[in-house]
Amino acid sequence: MGYSESRSESVSSKGKTSYGHELETVPLPEKKIYTTWPDMIRHWPKTTLCIVSNEFCERFSYYGMRTVLTFYLLNVLKFTDSQSTIFFNGFTVLCYTTPLLGSIVADGYIGKFWTIFSVSILYAIGQVVLALASTKNFQSSVHPWMDLSGLLIIAFGTGGIKPCVSAFGGDQFELGQERMLSLFFSMFYFSINAGSMISTFISPIFRSQPCLGQDSCYPMAFGIPAILMIVATLVFMGGSFWYKKNPPKDNVFGEVSRLMFRAVGNKMKSGSTPKEHWLLHYLTTHDCALDAKCLELQAEKRNKNLCQKKKFIDDVRSLLRVLVMFLPVPMFWALYDQQGSVWLIQAIQMDCRLSDTLLLLPDQMQTLNAVLILLFIPLFQVIIYPVAAKCVRLTPLRKMVTGGLLASLAFLITGFVQLQVNTTLPTLPEEGEASISFWNQFETDCTITVMSGIHKRVLPHDKYLHEDKKNKSGIYNLFTTKSPAKGNGDWTLTYDLSYDGACGDTSKLEKTVKVTAKSKKIIYVGVGSFGYYQNTANTDKPTDGTGEFSMGIVTVFNSSYGGNFAMCRQNTSDFDVNHPCNPRHPADFYFWETDYNSHTDDRDQNATITGSLSSQPAVTYKQKSVKPGYWQLYYLLNTPKDVDRQTYNKTATLVAPTNYGFHRVKQGGVFIYALTGTYENPKIHELQIVQSNSVSILWQIPQIVVITAAEILFSITGYEFAYSQSAPSMKALVQALWLLTTAAGDSIIVVITILNLFENMAVEFFVYAAAMFVVIAIFALLSIFYYTYNYYTTDEEDGEIGVDDEEEIEDHNPRYSIDNKGFHPDEKDTFDMHF
């Protein structure tokens, strides 16, 4: 047959509890438990397909937006790495705190169905607000308040849905369908990751496309998720006539809170009788004759000895046992949820090239997690779990402990990857220190010797001092200096220069250079026939996430020019040698303009040239991110890009050549181009301040594989554990509290980031790995010595247990227990009973 019959003996009409109290008859219903695939498919609640489809669309919407959110914070709202991490994970905290409100509304007021429908509309509104905000450029006054308002609405929307959808799906199953319920949670999680897989792959593509005059398209990346959220709402409503809609009964959270407060109050009163459990003190002042629920239950069951509050206390006690097991869980989420923030920032620092023409976008690495989830779910269900079960009894808590250990391993791997990434990052001076670079900008073959006390550096033509971690000779190392006084103020340094080669009349050249050092900064000093000048280097790597390098411009002409510049791609399909620059193709045109978009100026600062016969300053232009390719630098003779008018086409864009071009495929480097000599025939010098990324982004694959396996073992099992181990009256509340552990985990990330405890990301990853190992060890101990499995079904019939009017009740309610070997191992094995 396609099913087995589960027969459980009824408690005798005068049975005893573990405390010796008499019980009424407890009939356990006889149900068919379907075990074969044909029978499970035939008896499957079809309405759950609408729920799973809704979850797919909603997760597509959420993850599609969330995938590109960090880049949006970095590049549109102009937040720093730390600020982006704080806001990203802070948003996640809110998304996983608001489920508590959703649970209260669903259980106590309008039910799960109407809660899901109502907040879905709110959710869609938030997505639309965020999409509209993203249509404005970064200088618009709508930022950041409109963006953050949209995110706030989204957080309340997704939070209201989270505790209800999975629980609402579980409500569609009946006693005897436990195997189907377990498969439903796997299907549910599969739909989550199918939606996230597709969205995390295509949202970065939407983001990277030029639109609305920008070289990225966040309106598309946010707009399509908004559309999918509307679709999710419609799909959910499609099954509204066939859902099993359990009516709301009470505000369970409020009732639990009132019960606890009264129990504590009664316990604190002098002369209170000791109880087996502190919650039982609630019954000290409870009178069934004055309680509407007790009277209703007694009338329904025709038994004046029944007490609704005694059963409810039993439910709350089971809730507290589960919540104790939740205490170590936030640490797992503190690791797992760094994929969208800290791991993404790590990916930005890596080489995304699969070839010279093919890029794997950093935010697309999150797609691998979703793809692996889809592969791992059947792999674990069909192969790994059955094979492992032949060697060891598999229980939810054992799976979760294993998942926690794998999460620790994932961050150990991440730390070692970061150690390699660090070799391409700039080593910034410590507090009270500065690094000084000299840059030979002679137009001729002149060698400069720089002396600082006993330290000497020799700079041939076009060379510069820089940090090269791969070159052990140190012949071009930066000068490092410490402040002579305590504090972070500026201080002055003196260097002696000598010249050799085709340097012209050396008697007119500066022999002594005075440099103003700044704490924690890298200062570069340009030296040439014009004299010398100094600037503070911007060491920030580009964060656009589409393979960019960063470049700035300095003009040191012997005549006046402080106008516009443009970088124009030379290998486009429609390239016109007579009109080489097309401002209407943002990915092929980068510009530095001096007065545009309501008086925006891309000139960063003017540096005084010492020793120059001319009064012209060295004009410095801001660093901008440029995509890889074939580029030519031009003087831009008008202002084609301005918010007050339509962008010029290529024929209206006036340019003059500098006769300097290059081909660059590497990403992540930070460059400055100095133009010296004459405007008509400039000599261009290149200074690379920060190395290009050299560690392949593919090295993130091992850590993603391991964290995904951890997710399978911890998160899916946790969903099932939270649902199955709670009494029917507590299911939505327990789901909300399970989600609240994610909020607590992300709060850990936010607090650590705010405290700025780690300068080195690798050290931070190792600390997280160690913390996870310690916490999961505590979790294992709780599993072994504290928790005993108790499996509840969704078939709730209040008050089938009658308890005489006593102050104590048993801590385990046999009415809700069934013989499920996954949760109730052989009682002779005490260890397995717990862990």
Swiss-Prot record:
The chain crosses the membrane at residues 86-106, 113-133, 150-170, 183-203, 222-242, 325-345, 368-388, 401-421, 697-717, 738-758, 765-785. Keywords: Cell membrane, Membrane, Peptide transport, Protein transport, Transmembrane, Transmembrane helix, Transport. Disruption phenotype: Mutant worms have decreased body size, high fat stores, increased uptake of fatty acids, reduced brood size, retarded postembryonic growth, extended reproductive life span and increased resistance to stress. RNAi-mediated knockdown of the protein results in impaired synthesis of long-chain and polyunsaturated fatty acids. Pharyngeal pumping rate is similar to wild type but simultaneous knockdown with nhx-2 results in reduced rate of pharyngeal pumping and slightly higher acidic intestinal pH. Residues 821-835 have a biased composition (Basic and acidic residues). It comes from the Eukaryota. It is a multi-pass membrane protein. It is found in: Apical cell membrane. Coiled coil: none annotated. One of its GO terms (cellular component) is plasma membrane. PROSITE patterns: PTR2_1 (PS01022), PTR2_2 (PS01023). Residues 814-835 are annotated as: Disordered. One of its GO terms (molecular function) is dipeptide transmembrane transporter activity. Expressed specifically in the intestine. Signal peptide: none annotated. One of its GO terms (biological process) is regulation of TOR signaling. Pfam families: PTR2. Low-affinity peptide transporter that is necessary for proton-dependent uptake of di- or tripeptides, and to a minor extent tetrapeptides, in the intestine. Transport is independent of sodium and chloride ions. Controls the uptake of dietary fatty acids, plays a role in fatty acid synthesis and is responsible for dipeptide-induced acidification of the intestine. Regulates cellular pH differences together with the antiporter protein, nhx-2. Belongs to the major facilitator superfamily. Proton-dependent oligopeptide transporter (POT/PTR) (TC 2.A.17) family. This is Peptide transporter family 1. It comes from Caenorhabditis elegans. The gene is pept-1.
